[in-house]
Amino acid sequence: MLPAERKRRIVELVSDSDGRSVESLSDHLGYSKATIRRDLRELEDRGLIERSHGGAVPVTSVGREQTYGQKEVQNLEGKRAIADRAVEELAEGQVVFFDAGTTTMEVARKVPKDGTILGVTNSPRLAIELNEEDNEVKLTGGTLRRRTKALVGPTAESFMERTNFDLLFLGTNALDVESGLTTPNEDEARMKELMVEKAAKVVLVADLSKLGRRSFVQFASLEEIDLFITDGTLDADSREEIESAGVTVVDGVAR
């Protein structure tokens, strides 16, 4: 395993749990504790994890927002499995909005490059991915947030208020039965709120780590979601609560 791949796996393992010890990471990856400690120091310097006594913990909290780069390396297998299922919702001639985010980016990578949809997004990175070959793509315009690479602000909001979409692929930082869908940033929350409002069908694409978490600003209730696609398997209580809000749940897609 190359050093870059080893470090990516460390971030993934730490982020997918409440934390990992040096010993656990060493056993899992097959490298010495000294190597793991050096990697953790470097990853903390890059803002990808936080070191704790004897190991490392994720950097997330209610008011704290991970960067695009931090999220990009987390649970890639799960995100790709979600994307495989998500593109089954596409139909010829649709106008499809892709929310800015790392899971929606994986969905964009799976979209057929045959020009059968019109893609719209507030993510310049995602627009480049969609624009390969024959697909037509429109950007919202607006101010680019450095942390998440998402376009926000009055120009982006004005675009949203004048447009409508057949389908929305929506991401979230957190999903909680009581709080609904939440995100750390108010400008992004407003954009997501408009996406949901203007879409005929809302497909939430989020890995199971988002469930049971709350962030700073609510942008949608569960009742506004039509379909929830996730990698892991929901427990019976969570499934019942989400489905009782009228949401169709497709879980366990990474099995």
From Swiss-Prot:
A GO BP entry: fucose metabolic process
Keywords: Carbohydrate metabolism, DNA-binding, Fucose metabolism, Glucose metabolism, Repressor, Transcription, Transcription regulation
Annotated ranges, domain HTH deoR-type: 3-58
Entry-linked SUPFAM superfamilies: NagB/RpiA/CoA transferase-like (SSF100950), Winged helix' DNA-binding domain (SSF46785)
Start-end of DNA-binding region: 20-39
Keyword Glycosyltransferase among record annotations: no
InterPro entries: ArsR-like_HTH, Carb_Metab_HTH_regulators, DeoR-like_C, DeoR_HTH, Glycerol_resp_trans_regulator, NagB/RpiA_transferase-like, Tscrpt_reg_HTH_DeoR_CS, WH-like_DNA-bd_sf
Molecular function (Gene Ontology), one example: DNA binding
Knockout or disruption consequences: Leads to pfkB-specific transcript up-regulation.
Pfam family, one: HTH_DeoR
Function of the protein: Transcriptional repressor of genes encoding both fructose and glucose metabolic enzymes such as phosphofructokinase (PFK) or 2-keto-3-deoxy-D-gluconate kinase (KDGK) during growth on glycerol. Required for the glycerol-mediated repression of pfkB-specific transcripts, but not needed for the high-levels of the pfkB-specific transcript present when cells are grown on fructose.
Name this protein carries in UniProt: HTH-type transcriptional regulator GlpR
Source species of the chain: Haloferax volcanii (strain ATCC 29605 / DSM 3757 / JCM 8879 / NBRC 14742 / NCIMB 2012 / VKM B-1768 / DS2) (Halobacterium volcanii)
